[in-house]
A protein has these predicted regions:
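Non-catalytic sensory/regulatory segments that transmit input signals in bacterial signaling proteins
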Residues: 1-196
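Hydrophobic pocket-lining residues that define ligand/cofactor binding sites across diverse proteins
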Residues: 32, 207, 231
Length: 304
């Protein structure tokens, strides 16, 4: 019989040593396996090797995910876990997952991964899953460790599971960490053109001038087309398009002639029946997608 998991239980563990991680993660997974839960482990290749050895014969029942491949950009990571969890839940009624969280060395990217952890609560709320996010407390800075308590309803301590009194709802986290957005001055206006085909031609020309690799150019073309379609279908049409290189990334800004919207979760949640998938796709294909009210109107800023 599977454990009584009917909705997401998003927990965190801050460990001080690899030995502590292995002991607690293995016990967490084995308890689930004994009750018929599916099992997932996400870690570095070295971490996966250690967990395989620790689990012994039980490792055959576990799905292993290389975080080096999964943790590329936040929305892509959400989509990757959606696929992994869905596959497991086709086989078992509920699952347990251990994911070693990788924030990366660049402090400028930490807020993006904090947003990912916050959105995780909403994105997977409906799944019968107990997910344990693990953090190496011996090397992570205080800023990230503080975010652990703000993005996980429950944190496992030496004294057992503790409800976080610092926990914030996903939209609260995203609003709190959001930096004031503004049009990028490096970009130039290229306009939308007569139709979507001309829009893509203009954008492709700018990316060619910027030396953007062909594969990534296609990602931007697909993402920008989805964002533009959203502005036409749900907004007030397109007032302007600006594009160019900024801060080492290619950027595209699409200015909506309508009033815009106020939803920090837009594009982070997987589409369900009756909802569109355009912004979800755009977030997966690009590094970031931000919306703000700029001098010329409501603006979608896409960074590749």
């Amino acid at each position: 019989m599977s454990t009584d998991i009917t909705a997401l239980q998003h927990q965190a563990l801050v460990y001080d040593s690899l030995d502590e991680y292995v002991v607690r993660a293995a016990a967490f997974l084995r308890e689930g396996l004994e009750h018929g839960d599916g099992a997932v482990v996400a870690h570095t290749r070295a971490g996966i090797a250690v967990m395989r050895e620790a689990l012994g014969a039980d490792a055959d029942a576990v799905r292993f995910v290389d975080v080096g491949e999964a943790y590329t950009r936040p929305a892509h990571t959400l989509a990757a876990y959606h696929d992994v969890y869905a596959d497991q839940l086709h086989r078992t009624p509920s699952l347990r997952a251990v994911a070693d969280v990788q924030f990366g060395p660049d402090p400028g990217e930490w807020d993006l991964w904090t947003a990912y952890e916050a959105v995780f609560n909403e994105s997977f709320a409906h799944l019968p899953a107990r997910v344990l996010c693990t953090y190496d407390g011996s090397r992570l800075p205080e800023r990230i460790l503080d975010a652990v308590w703000r993005t996980h309803p429950t944190v496992l301590t030496e004294d057992g599971a503790r409800t976080s009194d610092c926990y914030e709802e996903p939209d609260q986290v995203l609003r709190r960490i959001a930096t004031p957005s503004a049009p990028l001055p490096q970009l130039r206006s290229i306009g939308f053109g007569r139709d979507a085909e001309e829009f893509r031609e203009r954008l492709a020309r700018e990316m060619n001038l910027a030396g953007t690799p062909a594969g990534r150019s296609l990602d931007m073309l697909l993402a920008a087309t989805e964002v533009a379609a959203n502005a036409v279908t749900h907004g007030g049409g397109i007032r302007d398009v600006r594009a160019g290189s900024a801060g080492g990334r290619f950027a595209c800004e699409i200015v909506d002639a309508g009033p815009g919207f106020d939803d920090p979760l837009a594009g982070y949640l997987a589409p369900r029946a009756g909802s569109g998938s355009g912004l979800w796709i755009a977030r997966q294909l690009t590094w970031s997608l931000e919306f703000f009210h700029g001098p010329r109107g409501f603006t979608a800023q896409i960074l590749l």
